[in-house]
Amino acid sequence: IRTMLKETDGVTFDKARCLNQELTFNYTKAVFQKQNVAFEDSNMKSLGLIDNDGYYTNAALLLSDQCEHSIKCAVYEDSTKLEFKARKEFYGSILKQVDEAYEYINLCNNQNSTFEGLMRVDHYDYPQYAVREALLNAVVHRDYDYSGSILINIFSNRIEFVSIGGLVKGITLHDVMAGVSQPRNTLIANVFYRLKLIESYGTGIQRIMESYQDQMVKPTFNIGPASFVVT
């Protein structure tokens, strides 16, 4: 039903008017300031965070301190879900969630060292660039029409990034691997691009694969009707 309504009126979640107009942007303003990007009302309008009638859109809600979505991280003892080691949930602006979730994942991303001659070379269990891209893709491209959280499952032998919502209609995994881009949340994608969090549309999956080009084990991508899982 949601999909039918969306196809009928052509308004995606991030472009729709937000029901909550009492929003604050403390964290987001700090990020914009750090990146030397203006965040005045005129800039918010040009970014689509304020509509033509002066109301906040859902894109503004996602960037606000009142964001209703979250990221849930779970750390398990081994390669199964039988026993938790730790759990943490991240709230607030999706920019805040990304920062805090990335920091948390890195605490579980063990650093190892090898030597090439006299030089020490540090390696992580998982390339930090791949972790960053998988996390950003999950946040930027998930389906925010659904209230469920992004799930990050950290096992002893792998990390799973579970994003709500499959691929945009008409796009296949082959298309994504080839760099075809059709952002579900164009306003959010543009904000992340302006903040230099993503470099360009359609390159995230390719960059994840490139970061593993010298490794035996490669990332996998599993797509369901309502989920996208990167392992």
Residue ranges and their predicted role:
Residues 181-211:
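Glycine-rich phosphate-binding loop
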Residues 1-147, 154-157, 165-183, 204, ...:
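Active-site helix-to-loop segments that bind/position phosphate- or nucleotide-bearing substrates
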Residues 153-155, 223-224:
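A structural signal for short secondary-structure junctions
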Residues 216-222:
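Glycine-rich ATP-binding loops of the HATPase_c
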